[in-house]
Amino acid sequence: MQLLFRPEVNSGRIERYGFDRLGFSAYRLAPGESVTGETGRDELGIVLLGGKCSVESAAGEWPSIGGRRNVFDGLPWAVYLPVATAFRVIAETDCDLAFCYSRAERRFQARLVTPADADIEIRGGANATRQINGIFKPDFPADRLLVVEVYTPSGNWSSYPPHKHDVHNPPGEVDLEEIYYYRIDRPAGYAIQKVYTPDRRIDQTFTVRDGELILVPEGYHPVVAAHGYNVYYLNALAGSARSMAASDDPEYAWVRETWKEKDPRLPLVR
């Protein structure tokens, strides 16, 4: 099963990767360039990974948003657009953009998310400490789409202990498709991600580099950042409920008890 992809930038296509709900597109725009589209049956989260742009839509307009040079330079800006909404994104500087789509049945209000809205959480402990910036968390008014960004310092683990969300058994776990879209702070850097099911029907380990994407259709999916390189990934999720409930791999759940303190390098951005 192919789970590692390098999305084609500026293709104009929504890549579904075999998912029922999620879709994804990547754009890199020069000043003055633009992207136009219509959300159709999807709700859409436009995340500015870097740069400054304006967003025009049938549901609202947001001029001159963004500003971080790249994901390691500050907190996120994003725009949420509901189903059946025409839009145009115009770059004011060089822009690095991620378009995260999810099939949706209900229509919600379009919204701008600014750095002041980012809900920063320092999760885990010891060398499994990481930073999570909430963009569209479960309490965000949307139908299915969930989006967060995660920073893992050099040598640290994240999505750890390994967890999964492939069974609808609330409140402990819900069934979610997930995408990991990566940025690394230096060109030679990489992360290692493993995706495996309890019965090892899926058991794959990947070396992931800047601009690559991992699909998580099911199973556990831990990540480790190579020593010397800070790792960022954008998570888009959608599924059976507006929740991020997940269950740990019981073989590794004990490590939580060993976490005495947080990694002082975090937060990496603020």
Predicted features and spans:
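A short glycine-rich, His/Asp/Glu-containing loop-to-beta-strand
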Residues: 5-36, 43, 128-179
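Residues that act as N-cap/strand-start positions at coil-to-secondary-structure junctions
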Residues: 11-13, 21-23, 31, 39-40, ...
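Extended, compositionally biased flexible segments
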Residues: 25-26, 31-90
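Glycine- and acidic-residue-biased ligand/ion/polar-headgroup-sensing regions
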Residues: 40-63, 81, 154-155, 166-213, ...
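A short, polar/proline- and glycine-enriched secondary-structure boundary/capping micro-motif
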Residues: 66, 100, 108-111, 171, ...
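Ligand-binding loop in jelly-roll beta-barrel domains
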Residues: 70-108, 209-210, 218-247
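Short, structured patches in soluble enzyme cores that scaffold and shape functional sites
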Residues: 83, 91, 99-103, 136-137, ...
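Double-stranded beta-helix
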Residues: 95-137, 194-196, 234-270
